[in-house]
Amino acid sequence: MDDGTVTNETRLGAVRDIQFAIDSLGIDDDMLVIAGDNVLDFSLVRFIEYARAKGTSCIMRFFEPSEQCLRKCGVVEVSSEDLVLGMEEKPSEPRSHWCCPPFYYYTRKDASLISAGITAGCGTDAPGSYIAWLSTLPPVHAMEMPGHRYDIGNLESYHTVCEQYDGIQPTATK
């Protein structure tokens, strides 16, 4: 998809990019949204099955012990039943140690609410902004990530991933 943006100053932002894809492709269904600068060592089959079993929009989460790292990601608070209680992008004071990478499953209903979220001021730059807004209209569930993800943020991290990545691990497929 190409929205025609040629500069950082005129880009739509992650949330508006999702809405652009919905509008351009006429999507009226459940959606799996994953940031393109991530590589996974596990299959997404289990995540999709989890979301369908819950019947709600879902996110993934992983435990991050470092508060410094938490200040650079989306941080999610969850109940003992995996319900999202709140989410904040790049908090100065993280309220949990659960990091939420940009892997989202939106139900058809919740995907249709993205434009309403934008209008309500959910934020459009960070992909987690919409989930943060959506979690105020429960339920949204959070599944613990069954493997590792590699975030390719720059050339150095790309080279690191090239050295370390060993493909999707069979034990992480389900």
Feature-to-residue mapping (PLM):
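Conserved beta-loop-beta/alpha segment of the NTase-like Rossmann-fold superfamily
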Residues: M1-V78
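Catalytic-core segments of class I nucleotidyltransferases/pyrophosphorylases
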Residues: I48-R52, L83-D151, L155-K174
